[in-house]
Amino acid sequence: MKKGSITEAINAIKQFDKIVIFHHVRPDGDCLGAQQGLFHLIKANFKNKEVKCVGNNNNLFSFINMTFTNQIDESFLKEALAIVVDANYKNRIELRELLDKNLFKAVLRIDHHPNEDDLNTSFNFVEESYVACCEQIVEMATVAKWTIPPVAATLLYIGIYTDSNRFLYSNTSYRTLYLAAILYKAKADIRIVHDHLNHTSLADLKFKKYVYNHFKTQGQVIYFICTKKIQKRLRMTADQCARVNLLSNIADYKIWLFFIEQANNEIRIELRSNGINVRDIAIKYGGGGHNNASGAIITNKKQISDVVSDCVKKIVYN
């Protein structure tokens, strides 16, 4: 899927003096890196623009400072461009109530997910060939010849590094590595990123042990169900349990899944695969994503067996 262009996104940013940048709920390295990295890019290259980031990093990546301004006057919104990074539907966007006011002059979506949206966008840079939204933004900076300050470089590197699973995913490309090298040259603090992300706590170790002792299999599908009872026992939050890649690339298993029970009793599904299109399955259950990495929400535990069966059938008939 391709919608809009790099040039369209760059020109939209140039056009507005007031900008508000949004990230998605359950934030990760890519949405936060894209939001905060773009914030610093704009501040460094357009001294007169007022830029605000809304949301919350939920204490993720605490080794680097992130800026959020969640109280914004309506007078500001009426003159502003809203930029939504790494997301498409309002129910997936933190502080969506600001978008629901319908006060923004225009909306720009920058995203690498091949999904439609309900944002009523005026401008788009949607292209699924990128491994990360941060990769898109680094290319924007390169095309526009923007200065990349070290703090922006570090934030954008976080997004590329995490969303490519440390450059291991199949859609990691020459372009990905080239743009990451540009961030190296811009003095991204690579060491602090790698040290932080490769750090393992005792709680992490106990969680991994539990997963490896309690995973289940069906056909060529391997999966783990993380109930609220398990989360309480291991003293983990639902978000902390979103670790589907603990089951990645195990011989003879083409699809791996995590089912994570949420506080409201819904169950978050993380779907990953090696060469099998799991996006279709995610869409069936109201979700979406990429062919090899998608997600969805189901409403009860009885649906878990349905999802697993769909994955088994997908492999058989692939």
Curated annotation (Swiss-Prot):
Which terms are listed as keywords in the entry? Exonuclease, Hydrolase, Nuclease
Q: What does this protein do?
A: Bifunctional enzyme which has both oligoribonuclease and pAp-phosphatase activities. Degrades RNA and DNA oligonucleotides with a length of 5 nucleotides and shorter, with a preference for longer oligomers. Converts 3'(2')-phosphoadenosine 5'-phosphate (PAP) to AMP.
Q: What is its EC number?
A: 3.1.-.-, 3.1.3.7
Q: Does the keyword Hydrolase apply?
A: yes
The Gene Ontology terms for molecular function here are: 3'(2'),5'-bisphosphate nucleotidase activity; exonuclease activity; nucleic acid binding
Q: Which family does it belong to?
A: Belongs to the NrnA oligoribonuclease family.
Q: Does the keyword Cytoplasm apply?
A: no
Please give the cofactor(s) recorded in the UniProt entry for this protein: a divalent metal cation
Question: What is the reported phenotype of gene knockout?
Answer: Probably essential, it was not disrupted in a global transposon mutagenesis study.
- One Pfam family name is DHHA1
Q: Which EC class is the enzyme in?
A: hydrolase
Q: From the UniProt record, list the reaction(s) this protein catalyses.
A: adenosine 3',5'-bisphosphate + H2O = AMP + phosphate
Query: Which organism does this sequence originate in?
Result: Mycoplasma genitalium (strain ATCC 33530 / DSM 19775 / NCTC 10195 / G37)
What protein is this chain from?
Answer: Bifunctional oligoribonuclease and PAP phosphatase NrnA
Query: What SUPFAM superfamilies does UniProt report for this protein, alphabetically?
Result: DHH phosphoesterases
Give the highest taxon in the source lineage: Bacteria
